[in-house]
Design a protein with these regions (language model features):
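Intrinsically disordered, low-complexity and often Lys/Arg-enriched segments
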Residues: 1-6, 133-139
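Active-site metal-binding core of divalent-cation-utilizing nuclease and nuclease-like domains
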Residues: 25-79, 120-123, 127-133, 139
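Mid-chain, well-packed structural core segment of small domains
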Residues: 63-101
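Nucleic-acid nuclease catalytic cores
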Residues: 86-135
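Interdomain/boundary linker segments immediately adjacent to catalytic/signaling cores
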Residues: 1-26
């Protein structure tokens, strides 16, 4: 499946900007929940529509699984919804990426931002989930 990376970059640009603003004002080494609360404030200030603790389920052989996953945020864009996973870790690791991959795969939302607020220099990774290849593609 061909994806337009410029369209994806434009879609996540305001989200990444809000994350950078939170990191700029709060700095490094805080807990994840403080960054999440601040990001909710920043998204609201920027009039970016979102749901915090976005809950979704999965299907198993046509039946809904009772347990729900919760992504930190789902931003509702004009063209696409975008998941945001916030971290406050020394560095982003494969487990964080796998979590986002699963969330995108199960929720049907194919664009995601993984943002690590804790380091002195924040880490931001942006991904597209391709349901045909079942892979995440960085952009």
């Amino acid at each position: 499946m061909a994806i337009d990376q410029n369209t994806l970059k434009q879609a996540v640009y305001p989200i990444v900007g809000a994350c950078h603003e939170v990191h700029k004002h709060l700095g490094a080494f805080l807990n994840e929940y403080m960054y999440q609360d601040a990001l909710a404030i920043e998204l609201s200030r920027r009039n970016i529509p979102y749901e915090k603790e976005f809950a979704f389920s999965a299907d198993y052989k046509g039946q809904r699984i009772e347990h729900q996953h919760k992504a930190d945020f789902c931003v509702h864009g004009a063209d696409t919804d975008i998941l945001i996973e916030c971290k406050a870790a020394d560095k982003l690791i494969d487990t964080h990426r796998q979590q986002l991959w699963n969330y995108m795969r199960l929720s049907g939302i194919h664009v995601g931002v993984l943002y690590n607020f804790a380091p002195m220099y924040a880490q931001c990774e942006k991904y597209y989930y391709d349901p045909v290849t079942v892979r995440m593609i960085a952009f």
